[in-house]
Regions:
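Flexible, acidic/Gly-rich N-terminal and inter-domain linker regions that tether
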Residues: 1-68
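Local cysteine-cluster metal-coordination motifs and their immediate loop/turn environment
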Residues: 68-78
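Core AdoMet radical
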Residues: 79-94, 102-127, 133-154, 161-212, ...
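Catalytic cores of alpha/beta
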Residues: 153-162, 233-246
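Conserved small/polar residues in nucleotide/adenosyl-binding loops
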Residues: 261-263
């Protein structure tokens, strides 16, 4: 990978993020920086790029940390063997970009996902560090949506919920057979295990807030997921049944659908 400046990285990694549909910020509590405290806001302002299910226009900086990946999911343009131009941000580059875009009134928050680099744990550490730095180092009060990695250490995934408004773990495909065939590096059992753990942590966080007002919020906008439609032999009934099961088992805020893009 040649040396790229920030503008070039942004062009590549913002374009690569367009294949992720799960980008709505409904459900979070309102926070702002009026009164001179912190920076950022979850309330609508600036350039709107998406609509939340409650009808509000929202603007998010939607990027990947990197489009490099050690996995070879056949449906993904960023898969290991895909011939695309690669780029990578450091955690601090994403932090500074988010702050710069917010202060220019371009965005209300950040949607951050990533390809897998080095290992699932390493990548998850970088994603969490972005959110941690925004919240703790810069008192950022805007919206943060983090894509989490089911193969990562559960403690790292848990840390994501301490800093993000919403977290999401992609189920990828409607059927287990499709996942085994098209994404052999991924496991439906591990994905659902991570979603179950997140559901429990969200519920524990809500219970703690009921008992203790000082208890920290944990993913107040809940968790969501995304599945690709058209990549396997799943019927409409299979897709609807799968989504219904996910809503019931994991109390998801939303299941997003992305049509297969032939690459």
């Amino acid at each position: 990978m040649g040396q790229l400046d920030t503008r070039q990285k942004l062009a590549i990694l913002a374009d690569a993020a367009k294949y992720d549909a799960s980008c709505a910020s409904s459900g979070t509590s309102k926070r702002d920086s009026r009164g001179g405290k912190g920076v950022g806001s979850t309330e609508g302002m600036g350039i709107c790029h998406a609509y939340a299910p409650d009808g509000r226009c929202i603007s998010l900086l939607k990027i990947l940390l990197t489009n490099s990946c050690i996995f070879d999911c056949h449906y993904c343009i960023n898969r290991k063997n895909s011939n695309v131009r690669r780029a990578r941000f450091t955690a601090q580059e994403v932090v500074q970009l988010t702050l710069a875009f917010y202060k220019r009134n371009y965005i209300e928050g950040l949607f951050l996902s990533s390809g897998i680099i080095h290992s699932s744990n390493y990548t998850m550490e970088q994603l969490v560090e972005v959110a941690r730095s925004l919240r703790e180092d810069h008192d950022f009060r805007g919206y943060i949506h983090l894509k989490t990695i089911p193969d990562a250490d559960p403690e790292l995934v848990h840390q994501a919920g301490l800093h993000a408004d919403r977290v999401s773990i992609n189920v990828e495909l409607p059927t287990v057979g499709g996942l085994e065939r098209l994404a052999p590096d991924k496991s439906a059992m591990r994905i659902e295990g991570a979603m179950k753990g997140m559901k429990g942590a969200i519920e524990d966080g809500r219970d703690a807030r009921k008992k203790y007002r000082s208890a920290p919020k944990f993913a107040p906008a809940g968790q969501s997921t995304q599945m690709i439609v058209g990549a396997d032999a799943a019927s409409d009934g299979d897709i609807i049944s799968r989504a219904s099961t996910l809503y019931d088992r994991f109390r998801l805020r939303r299941v997003y659908y992305l049509s297969l893009i032939h690459i």
